Amino acid sequence: MTLTTAEWASFRALIDEPVDHKELECQAYLIHAAGLLLPGDPSSIVAATEERNFFGRTDFIIAADILDDTNQNSRHAYIFELKAPQCHLFETVTANRCQPTRDFIAAENQLLHYYDEAVGNARFRQRMNIVDQDNIHIGGVIIGTLGRLLRGGGNLPAARTALRVREKYFYPNRKLRVLTWDRISDYVRP
């Protein structure tokens, strides 16, 4: 699924919007990034947005048939929490340490709750055509841009360290990924 140059320019304009939050408008472009968001060589790709659950609304779910190492297809779903490209990931605490912004922490928290709900929900598995609950995965958080990594600029190496530490200690077990909207934009650029 390839974007035209005009479609990509419209997407990029949403990301570059300086003030208004454009999360919902950007959401529609994520299906074009399936190759980035899903592992392997996915087929029969479908997406669901704003999927209602006990805790709220799951922003983005992408499901696909994925070929495994024994050459068998099985259906998998990946759950993503979105925050606007206009959100920052980190803010400065001290000269050498950053902490996640309220938006970033909220995204992680929502993602964990939505994932936990989906794994235990037989109706969700039925709607997504998932047989095994182990085939429901945390996809990740899509938030901000590289330019909005750190609120107010400043010590960018400290912000990168803060993200690296989270990726090293918090995320590996469930393979949670943190992507920026400009990463998505670069991937879908025609």
Predicted regions and their residues:
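Charged, terminal alpha-helix-loop-beta segments
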Residues: 1-190
